[in-house]
Amino acid sequence: MTTHGWGTRILLGAALAALTLLGGCNDADSGERNRLPGFVSGSVRTTAYDGTSDDLLTAGLGKTGLASTAPAFANPSRPTSAELRRLAIWSNYRALVDMSANGGYGRFWGPNVDLDGNATLGEGKIPGTEYLAYSDDGSGRKNVTLLVQVPASFDPKQPCIVTATSSGSRGVYGAISAAGEWGLKRGCAVAYNDKGGGNGAHELGSDTITLIDGTLANAVLAGNASLFTANVTSGDLAAFNGRFPNRYAFKHAHSQQNPEQDWGHATLQAVEFAYWALNEQFGPVLDSSHHGVRYHPGDITTIAASVSNGGGAALAAAEQDTRRWITAVVVGEPQVNVRMSPNAIVREGGQPAPSFGRPLADYATLANLLQPCAAASASLAGEPYLSGLPAATTQSIRTQRCATLAAAGLVSGADTQSQAADALAQLHAAGYLADSDLLQASMWDSQAIPAIAVTYANAYTRSRVTDNLCNFSFATTSAPTGTVASPAASPMPAIFGVGNGVPPTGGIDLVFNTGAGVDHRLATPDASFAGALCLRQLWTNGMLDMPANVDAVRVNANLQGKPAIIVQGRSDALVPVNHASRAYVAQNSISEGARSQLVFYEVTNGQHFDAFLPVAGFDTRFVPVHYYNVQALNLMWRHLKNGAALPPSQVIRTVPRGGTPGAAPALTSANLPPIATSPGANAITAGAGAIDVPL
């Protein structure tokens, strides 16, 4: 590996570029100089990886290392940027796929599995070059991280780009297994960005932040080089630290910029940055310091891809694209807030869905309020258990949440079971499918929904960390009481490598500020009901400009005639399919009408988190949606390159593995039927604002 520091750009492939000047796109280049896009702030860091000691896909760990324990730091208090990158790739790769051999890793997907689904690639290390930089508006506060990976197998005569916008609020490697891996194996450049969230953490007590490579610095000294610094005056910070010690600010929650409104824009910038990198690497040599422009907008086959929030960003980018940067779209389980027309409708089995097209601010705050109670329903017996708390504590939380909801008039029933049944019925009425019932507990117990409710409420109200919105904050705590306490060692040195940008993460917890502050699950017998109700009321009462900020993130479902594939699991309990993919397809049939080239594949027994599939009860009931994301990318590639028709929209009826929870039999192709060319009765239809999905 060769690493070049800040302020230096290496012109890799100059000799090759000179030799191939007459090949590929724009052969008769006029000598136009390749210029760094104006949104790039500061220098570009360029690093070459040999594919042996280090590489683009696995950071030198290979297929075996990714499946093993986390790579260690030589000095845990001062990890190097290379060590942090390795840990970030290890943790982000594992966060989005099932890493168990029985679940399919190493057989259906993984660095060793080629694009045809065969395990032919050994450890799967991929040599190539990375380009890393910030995008900013001149304020030094946006600092969206952009990263381009150019594999050594990139063919400048057949250029392609795949976007891999981070999922969730993850750092820049946050979609490496979801989209980056496929792109690298295809020989495409991969354009990553962190959407302006990027796992940016600010340790308020020590005034410590992370830089673009994850290394630490003092916030004041770092200045505009900081990934994120909370917008708090020194006086306010000192006062806050005095009252609320051991607290942390996070970029997605506390940047006061509502970054979601710019996710599409950031993805387009990532593509433009990739064009610059490819021109820099393969463009004609103009002189000893400059390359020319070989590729102009639209010259490179570009697939906007990713999952979850990254999928939503890809759709937004395709909608906003006015310069032909994007050729096609392939996304999984996209988190999108759709601007719905009054005449749009979602039907399943011929029956109208009770609710569809709600924004995340609505359904997440409702779920955060009701899920702990709904989870107590006897009808959900045998649901997977994803809490780190003792089962007795969890059951007590559920009972107490039901009782408090009933006392507040928010659920009906004289006992826990009737209250839980009503809570579950309310979730159904709000658009959650019965297919996701057994995941309601997991979404709250894993703290996914509480984390999302708090982070997005902060973002949508543009709150400062010092506001302690709804009395929640992020802090280190002590076990087993969950009380806020100073950590034995700061979580900051490793946060770039292990954090996901939405506490609880990386040793930083979500706390409710009772007394000194306590883990929100343990702060009160009903698990901080008052805070959950406050979050809900921000939406229902239209407080603190939340409706306007939510409106700013909505998409219009007009892909401008671009071919597109959406894949989502029917059992998704984090981003309900009625509010996301189904709503998007319905609205697309209005926004684009006959121009639409969008197809939608709904996967039965598929849910949001493939990384949960090794857990007992997940393994027996649910299948990997990632498998179908990869198939969709292959289908789109054949469509773009060979003119093959995309299979029509359909329900894919998978077969759960079954067996004993925690010991399900190995996944086989029998569990994963192919996407059908002629789906027959499984066809999904859309037109004039209506989507019809068969039961």
Swiss-Prot record:
<feature type="active site" description="Charge relay system">
    <location>
        <position position="308"/>
    </location>
</feature>
<comment type="pathway">
    <text>Lipid metabolism; butanoate metabolism.</text>
</comment>
<dbReference type="Pfam" id="PF10605">
    <property type="entry name" value="3HBOH"/>
</dbReference>
<keyword id="KW-0378">Hydrolase</keyword>
<protein>
    <recommendedName>
        <fullName>D-(-)-3-hydroxybutyrate oligomer hydrolase</fullName>
        <ecNumber>3.1.1.22</ecNumber>
    </recommendedName>
</protein>
<comment type="function">
    <text>Participates in the degradation of poly-3-hydroxybutyrate (PHB). It works downstream of poly(3-hydroxybutyrate) depolymerase, hydrolyzing D(-)-3-hydroxybutyrate oligomers of various length (3HB-oligomers) into 3HB-monomers.</text>
</comment>
<comment type="similarity">
    <text>Belongs to the D-(-)-3-hydroxybutyrate oligomer hydrolase family.</text>
</comment>
<keyword id="KW-0732">Signal</keyword>
<dbReference type="GO" id="GO:0047989">
    <property type="term" value="F:hydroxybutyrate-dimer hydrolase activity"/>
</dbReference>
<dbReference type="InterPro" id="IPR016582">
    <property type="entry name" value="OHBut_olig_hydro_put"/>
</dbReference>
<keyword id="KW-0964">Secreted</keyword>
<dbReference type="GO" id="GO:0005615">
    <property type="term" value="C:extracellular space"/>
</dbReference>
<dbReference type="GO" id="GO:0019605">
    <property type="term" value="P:butyrate metabolic process"/>
</dbReference>
<feature type="signal peptide">
    <location>
        <begin position="1"/>
        <end position="17"/>
    </location>
</feature>
